[in-house]
Structures are given as structure tokens and as C-alpha cells.
Amino acid sequence: MKILLAVVIVAISSTIACADEPPVIPVGLDAYRMWDRWPHQRIGARAYMRSTYDRTGGNRGPDASHFLYQLADDHNVTLDVAGAGVLYFARYNHWHGSPWHYVVDGTDHIVRETSTADPNKPAENSVFIPEAPLPTPLTWTWLVTKGADLMWVPIGFEKSFQMAYSRTRYGTGYYIYHHYVPGARLSQPICAWDAKTAPTSDVLDLLRAAGTDIAPPGNLVQGKLSIPKEGELRVARLAALEPSGGVVRALTFSVPKSSALALSNVRLRVTWDDRPEPSIDAPLALFFGAGTLYNRDGREYLVKALPVNIRFADDRVHLACYFPMPFFRSATISLAGAGEEIADVKWTARFENLAVPKNHVGYFHATYRDHPKPEHGQDMVLLDTRTVEGGGDWTGTFVGTSFIFSHNAVLTTLEGDPRFFFDDSNSPQAQGTGTEEWGGGGDYWGGRNMTLPLAGHPCGAPSAKEAKDDHDKIQSAYRFLLADLMPFGRNARICLEHGSVNESKEHYETVTYWYGLPGASVVPTDELKIGDEASEEAHAYASPDASAPYRIKSRYELGPHELDGKETYPAHEDVGRVTKTASEFTLKVRPDNFGVMLRRKLDYAYPNQRADVFIAEVSEGSRDVFWKLAGVWYTAGSNACIYSNPREELGETQHNVVVSNRRFRDDEFLIGRELTQGKDAIRVRVKFTPVNIPLFPGYPLTETAWSEINYKAYCFVMPPMPK
């Protein structure tokens, strides 16, 4: 047995960026071209995932066809965003909803799927239309995905974006988009999508390369070993010379096919810089994207994803990982036995120098959680960075999950919604419609398997009766985030509903992939509590036309508030005001900020809240205030929505009004650094600009107003250099 104990990496002489300035954020197609920047901090970027979920917390539909409002029977709005940004992902159930309206900066582009022509006889070789700007492998349709239409083409917008469905039968969908703080260091300007320009071949070629070795050559170390039945075996220790650091660019293992099942539950552990706990600690199979290495139908690729793959060839099974994994001093790679000795294990690792400042990147983490008995009525917590690896603040990005959702080929677990929370938000900034939707499928994948560059259902029999043995009953899926990754600057809480309403008794296992550096890049600096006399006075709050403070008892948007007669999410009280004119207040900020995020808690019973936001300097003794426009703050929809889900493919649009008991919501607005940097306080003015849109044509208008319960200021800052 040959084990490499240490490898010295030659240090580079200088770095190519400044540690005091945020790294460049890859935008649009650059997010694919610059995939080697997966570990980089996204300071000033925020991700949001919206969907057609049941607003009452249940599983009506299931989670299909809930719309913000209807402009016409063939224009059912499901996403409405103000400001510049990029839509990075959209998922639909089969062709349902097509034709879709992609309204970019006021221009209505019609996007179709070829099954639209006759949805009762769907086209098996369906594609997105227009095909040139929406090509495979940035898009996939239901025959390949086994139930979903998926779109990863970046859709840029400079002022606004709306998405609407023309048809509402089974209109399930979720969508991921990014906003950027004005003045953020972007790799290219955001340009409005024109529905004509085709993605460049380099991006398509990258995604077509899924399943192959996509990493640069680098420095290679390799070896051969036997994994003991018990205990932990060090595979390699990589050492970096200061002040450079290194990046693991490829990590592979292979065993004879006869040892594949035994390898499934061997634990991979990787510790960066001799930290007290490993940042990667997960069963090998699940880490590489599959719940088991059982290959039910003898496929070459069990997993053919971009960052990982599992390939059966040459009488061996090969596992490869190409996530870039930075370290600053050392990387220790170990394997822990799982009850059976495994011989003839071959491994390789490739690495290169870290060519950027250390506080520009984060460690790679794969956090494993075992959920043998999910808690009744509560979401499973796949990751809470406040408690993992010593807890505290972390700054980084959430980049995916690999998860087992049943050990018994039970597929009803797939009704569970993903909900993700970032940087103290009480509202999920990401709310999905179901578990197989998150994994890139639809309708439980029809019980079939599939593997794509960024999503897949690699293993599991269609049913327990059809399983060839117990290994074949293990159902798993994966979802990786590249262009659509989700940044956080302080903490991340990644949750998944089990079953349709947190009632499942199935055994789940999850691996959550994320990049994170200890420390914060989003820092709270102040809070104004509306209705609190002392807080209003301290923040010079002024809103002459605002209502008197009023009490609200309600909830945030989570799962069912009651299950089996027991309350799961109790209501709570808070105090707020509403105004139909303007409010002003002062908030403290850090002078070294790179922009400020305002977070507002609001009463979501008031629909389509929109305001122009102005910023001024705080100057003692001066009566002159010079306001500068920071942008438009818009929160589309309300706790009332439209549900339209006719039974027939071409059924008439319905106008069912659904009102939830969830009136609390946290919402965010980004202020550019040119208005905030170098200041220790800013004066904020929000001027209400009403948006009068009925839930559907002819429905009475609901009273509109700007709701304020609290305002919090968070500053974007550079994270500290690693110790």
C-alpha cells in the first residue's frame, strides 16, 4: 500500500487581485465560462427563487398554478421583478404553461415548447422555441428529463422582468434570478435578452463535456491502497507554501466493479488547513451524486454531471470530482471504512496554485446529514452554517445537494418543497414546489432514471415491487448550482420539506455542497423598529401621513401551520404602519462598505408594494438635503393569489382567489456603493408609487399602501483574511 503523505506546492510570486476589493462576479454566460471561479465570493450578489407554490403552506395542485395576478386569461403572471438582474434558471412541468411570456424591460418575448401545438398529443422530440437562443444543453425537455422542461439560458434584464403563463393546466414552475448591488464588480454589463442571440459555443461545449475530465492538468499525485473495514486511513496530505495556497482541481477514485457496493458508504473526509473538523465528511456514493453505486441497468454513467461523475468502464467503477477546492496551507484527504475491506483502490488528486487573495474564495464543504426519522411537522435542516464546523459567521455560496429521499422506493416523499434562508431572513428567499422538481424532474420522473450536467435522478427502481434487490430501492437525486448559485454573507439555512406537508416517515440522507470562509461579508449595522417610539426617534423617522401603529398577528410563509390538530408554526404579533406618501429615516452603516442591503419586514396583505428609494448624506446642522435616486423597491403580489388549474390541457383559465394567513414577509433592496461608501450613516427616503393591478380583470382593486414593520441595514464588506 502506497500512501502519499505530503506534497509541496510551489508558491506563486504575487496575486492577481487586491485583497481589499471584492472579486469580479461572473455574469450571464460568463458564469459558465468562468466556472473555475465557483469558489469565489459573490459580494454584492443576491439570489432569489420564486415559484407557483401553494401560498397557504399546503400542497394544493400540487403546488401548481398559483399566480401573482392575471392580466388576461392568457397572461397569468408568476414572476414580476423590478431593477436590473439575470434570470438564470426556469423549470416547468412538461410543456405546461407554454406559450410563456418573457417580458424583458417591457418587451414581450413569446417562448414556446413544441408540444404546445397539440398538448393532448405532445411532441416527443420537443424543443424550446425560438431554438437558436434556447439550445440544448442549456435547455432540456420532458422526454430527456423524465417530466420537466428546464432552461439554464441566462436572461438579462436592465429594468424589469415578468414571466407569465398562457395556459394554466398543471402550471408548476420555479425560477432562480440574481440581483446585484449597483456598482458591483461584474464580469460584463447586464444586457437585455433579445430572444435572438444564440449562446456561444464555448458554453455549450462545456456542458456537453459533463462526464469527462474538465479540470486543467495541474500537478498530479496518485496512489493505490486498501480501505480497512474500520477506522480512518489517510490518503494524502497536500501542503502549500505561504503566501500562495492551493486549489484541488480534481479528485478521483476507482475500484473493481465487484467492490462498487462496498464502496458506497465509505466516508470521504477532507480537512482544510488542519481545521478541527473536516469540511467534507460524506458517504462516497452520495458525495459523487448517487445514493448507491448499484447500477440497476448496467449504464456506463450512473452520474454524468458537470462537477462530478460516476462511470462504469474497463471492469472498474470510476468516481471523479471537479469542484475547485481551495486551501491555504494544507489539505488532508482520508477514507473511513464502512464494515468491509476493499482492495485495489486507485486514487488521484490534481492541484494548482491559488492565484487570488485568500479572502476572495471559500473552502469547499460537503455537509452530510442523516434523517432516519424526520421530525413530524418540521422541515428537515440540511445545513445551518450557524452550527456547522464550529458555527459563527460564514461567507460563501450554496452550490447544490445530493440526497436520498427513500430507502424503500417510496416516491410520495417527492412532494416536499425546498426552502432556503440566507443572512438572517425569516422569509425563504428560495421557495420551490417539490423535491423532484428540485432534482430536475417532474411527476416523480415517471419512476425512471436520468442524469444531466446539473440535475439528475441516477438511481432507484420505479417501485418496490420492481426493485431487483434492496439496493435498487434506494432513491436519490442531485442538483448542482453554477450560474444559479446562491450567495450568502453571514449564514445559510437549507431546508427541505419531507412528504407533502412534513409528514413522511421515510429515511432521508443528504449532502449539501457549499463554499464558505469563516467571517462575514454581509454585516448588520442598524435596525429601525416601526411603532417603537424610542427607535423611531433615534432614527429620525418621519412619515407625516403614515397610519398610527397597528398590531398584526400572523406568520411568515412556511409549511402548514397545523398538522394533525397540532400547531407547527405559531402566529406571532408585531407592530407596523402604512403610508401612501413617503417615509424618511436614518440608518448607521460602515464606511468601508461596498454597498448596503436594506431589509424590510412588511405586511404582505397590501399588494404590489412599490416605492422609489432615495439616499442622502447625513449632515449635522444643515437643513439642505440632496436626494439621489437609488432605484425602485418593488414587492410583487400579496398574501392573496389566483389559483387556476383546469382539468383539461386546454381548459379555460379559472379565477379562484386564495388568501393565506401568512402576512409577514422580509424583502430586500440593494443600494450602490457610490451612495454609501465612506459614510457612517445614510438618510433614506421611500416614496410610495402605487401599482393598481386587480387579481384578475374585473376583480375589485385591493387597497394599496407601503407597509413598514422594521428596516434593517446590512453592509457588504470584505471578509477577513483567513487566520
Where are these regions (language model features)?
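Intrinsically disordered, low-complexity polar segments enriched in Ser/Thr/Pro and acidic
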Residues: 555-556, 721
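Bacterial N-terminal signal peptides
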Residues: 5-14
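Beta-strand-rich ligand-recognition modules
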Residues: 120-158, 301-305, 309-320, 326, ...
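Beta-strand-centric surfaces of beta-sandwich/beta-rich domains
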Residues: 20-551, 573, 580, 602
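Basic/polar N-terminal segments that are highly enriched at the extreme N-terminus
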Residues: 16-23, 723
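Intrinsically disordered, low-complexity segments enriched in Ser/Pro/Gly/Ala and basic residues
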Residues: 12-13, 291, 618-621
